[in-house]
């Protein structure tokens, strides 16, 4: 039976709608972030990224994201006194709840220098529409000084141990990754101070504390799972487009301060670290992760550079699975299957 004009109208309308829909999906932009961390308030997720003032996005499903705010409208007042070459970009945040507030740690530095400091700003809520929304900067938590310190005060991540004490891991290049106990209000190191080295690669030669050295390791993040603390770290180089060699390794320990060992039993302080994920031709420069347990499942949050988009950094959230020996596994195929969408 021949189609009526009305039927033809509906067919053409549906076809046009499908075409427009597919075009929208194809053109939907992914969220471009670096060094992502996340938290949740109510039914909303908040994502924090390196950028001017620390970029914040919000989502109710961890796929569709809207720009929310920046934690700083202008740079911290003390930033240039610590790092004269600071360019306004706050690096490598960490977000955690404490005392009914959200604690946002961040890094002030200049590329390749350890003229660096980790700062803290706090807020009662992450909802920018709330009358209680206001970031209050608490200043410097720790600072590294060239020719004094053989470490770099960037890339903070806070973990609470089984006794309720808060510890901050941090570090990039130089003599590797460190961890120290925070005081009761999480604003400074606890006294007397307790510091530990948790991972390093090549040693920095004596007398060259102003140089990063060859030890390509940074961005520690610790996740407690079962009987172990799992230390994730980024090896290699970021921020070099097609030449980026960033990839993720992991070790574990029974104590938050270590020693962290890899699958072969090698101490991460002696260069140990088991490969977790390296990427492929489509996705390079994988790294600077965080890791979380949400609603009974475990997730790895990281950035990856997309080759097809001129190596622009994209948000990736991957499922963490665990093998019979209790080691984390992630599926490289999820780099393709997880596609964030930035909403207007």
Can you annotate each of these PLM segments?
Residues 2-14:
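Bacterial N-terminal signal peptides that target proteins for export
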């Amino acid at each position: 039976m021949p189609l009526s004009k009305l039927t033809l109208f509906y067919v053409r309308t549906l076809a046009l709608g499908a075409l427009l829909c597919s075009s929208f999906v194809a053109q939907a932009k992914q969220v471009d972030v670096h060094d992502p961390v996340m938290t949740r308030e109510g039914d909303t997720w908040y994502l924090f990224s390196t950028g001017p003032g620390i970029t914040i996005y919000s989502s109710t499903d961890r796929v569709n994201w809207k720009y929310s705010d920046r934690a700083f409208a202008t740079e911290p007042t003390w930033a240039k006194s610590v790092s004269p070459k600071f360019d306004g970009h706050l690096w490598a945040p960490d977000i955690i709840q404490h005392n009914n507030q959200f604690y946002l740690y961040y890094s002030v530095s200049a590329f390749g220098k350890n003229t660096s400091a980790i700062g803290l700003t706090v807020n009662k809520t992450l909802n920018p529409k709330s009358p209680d929304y206001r970031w209050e900067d608490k200043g410097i938590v720790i600072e590294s000084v060239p020719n004094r310190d053989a470490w770099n005060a960037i890339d903070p991540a806070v973990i609470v141990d089984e006794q309720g004490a808060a510890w901050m891991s941090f570090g990039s290049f130089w003599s590797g990754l460190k961890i120290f106990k925070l005081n009761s209000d999480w604003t400074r190191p606890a006294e007397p101070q307790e510091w530990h080295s948790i991972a390093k690669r090549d040693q920095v030669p004596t007398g060259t504390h102003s140089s990063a050295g060859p030890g390509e390791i940074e961005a520690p993040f610790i996740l407690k799972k079962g009987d172990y603390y799992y230390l994730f770290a980024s090896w290699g180089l970021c921020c070099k487009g097609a030449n980026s060699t960033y990839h993720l390794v992991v070790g574990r320990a029974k104590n938050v301060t270590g020693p962290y060992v890899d699958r072969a039993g090698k101490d991460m302080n002696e260069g140990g670290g088991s490969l977790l994920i390296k990427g492929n031709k489509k996705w390079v420069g994988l790294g600077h992760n965080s890791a979380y347990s949400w609603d009974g499942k475990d997730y790895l949050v990281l950035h990856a550079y997309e080759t097809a988009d001129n190596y622009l950094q994209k948000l990736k959230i991957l499922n963490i699975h665990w093998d019979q020996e209790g080691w984390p596994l992630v599926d490289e195929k999820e780099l393709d299957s997880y596609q964030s969408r930035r909403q207007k």
